[in-house]
Amino acid sequence: MLDPGLLPPDALFIMQVFDSRFLPATFALCLLQFLFGPRAEAEQKLRMPNIFGDQMVLQRDNPIRIWGWAGAECPVVVSFAGQSQSTAADRDGKWEVLLQALPAHSSGQAFTVKSREEVLSFKDVLVGDVWLCGGQSNMEWRLRGSRDADLEIPSSNYPGLRFIRIRPGGSPAPQDNFPKEKGEGAWLPCSPETAGDCSGVAYFFGQRLHRHLNVPIGLINAAWGGTMAQHWVSRETLETLPAAQTYLGDYDRKCREWVDGGREEGASKRFTLAQEQWQALAEDARKRGDKDPPGKPNRRDYQNPAEGRIPAGPLNAMIMPLAGLNLRGVLFYQGENNSFGDAWIPFRETFPAVVSDWRRLFRNNDLPFGIIQIAGWSTRRSMTYDMNHHTNVVREVQFNTWRSTSNTGLIVSFDANSNSSIHPGRKHPVGDRAARWALSEVHGVMDDARRKPLQWRGPVYESMKKEKDRIHIAFEEGSDEGLRLERADARGFYIAGRDKIFHHAEARVIAARDAPPQVEVWSDDVPDPVAVRYAWSNLPLGSLMNGKELPAYPFRTDTWPLKPHYGEALYEIAPGDEG
């Protein structure tokens, strides 16, 4: 059978079109075999995915999966750290071995793969913990563009901290490899010369783990700015999600139009024609004194639809080449682009699907998954708090995914933004908080002074109780230790009566003897309160934290439907999502 991973991009596009049932799939495969098959088979040699290379880190304490390709049915021997494993490639040239589990090892060792006369050799390979750091631009954001980079980079000499950046891209079909070019697709030890290209969040996360655990840390940065959750979920899974059908249908329609229009030439003609038609309408409107009509053609809408940010595209191009790799866990920072327009609508289905899909791809149904809750951001048009902004939906979906999915963690980041930008420059606190979660929940690190697990959560809302004209808020045990308001400031609290109109509220921490602390919330404008919200806006303000200065999670005590902008749909909490 023809291996799709060996096909050139044009062939993959053809396969995508046929797979969408525009023509019979069997005919497509026969055509592709005729066009590309003989050449691909003739060129089959010993090779491995680019995730394997010089200076890489392999996952400790578990059998290590190694795979690649060789001549059909040729013998293959993999040797590393004093052990060798033999196998033979199958008829399609694919092979796979499992090395025995190894402890952490900070001294670089040679890694070799042999098949008859062919040899692949990788040098300076370490054994430690490997983390996949995915998402969109805030995870892609390089250390050199982060706050205090001028202080951090000169001291970033950590030979045991390694990272690899996977070039952003999309594909209509799953890929077996990613490109290695222009400094991307290759492992690098962290040093003042290289650290600036590491993801800022991933760097601070990995650096803290490396220093605390004293083992090598490998960071795989597979992030792409502007992506949505549906871009990181497989096509097969998306087809089972009702809210994703609009996106799939729109993509398939664009594929049909592209092919029917004659690919690039036809697309250019359609764009020119659409421009002429719109210009004619605009001239008529101006003569009448009206505004320009909507729908001005955008050349991007006439590009190859199988390129770029398409449903499942980044997953196919950036994650599928890693499928089956041994990982310690995942750190995922995504959601900003699902807070634009009506992109929040499928998020409740697609975001949890990222977790389940990635766990399936990496063959670990309990793979630790750290979720970074999106930061606050705003625009010049909306600098005040906005209860119905899409970001509130996104953060609540992220919170509910954490609460309903085992072995996940949620890291707060809304307070890391000091400039209202969608790209906060302060990556250090976000990386540190993520490291707290990993150390506590994944590695079981204890706080010796407290004789308790290392604290990683801020206060988590648990319940409310009305006391006359005030509401008392209780928090989950363990998250409320040292509960306090920064400088006794009540920023971020809002309270409403039965009219569902929220007002800025006053708040204070109260603590009866032998009872856990609570927050008392009130407003003279709301004599009969029924609901409280905290840090509930597009650019949240908040002052509530625990003794470790970990911020409280945004919360609301009500379940009232939200009406996010730009759409008529309501957002309501699904049964069982109350947290």
Outline where the language-model segments fall.
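Cell-envelope and extracellular/periplasmic
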Residues: E43-G579
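Sec/Tat signal peptide C-region and signal peptidase I cleavage site
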Residues: P38-A42
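Bacterial N-terminal signal peptides
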Residues: A25-F34
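N-terminal secretory signal peptides that target proteins for export/translocation
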Residues: M1-R21
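Short, solvent-exposed linear motifs at loop/edge-of-secondary-structure regions
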Residues: M1, L6, T26, P529-V530
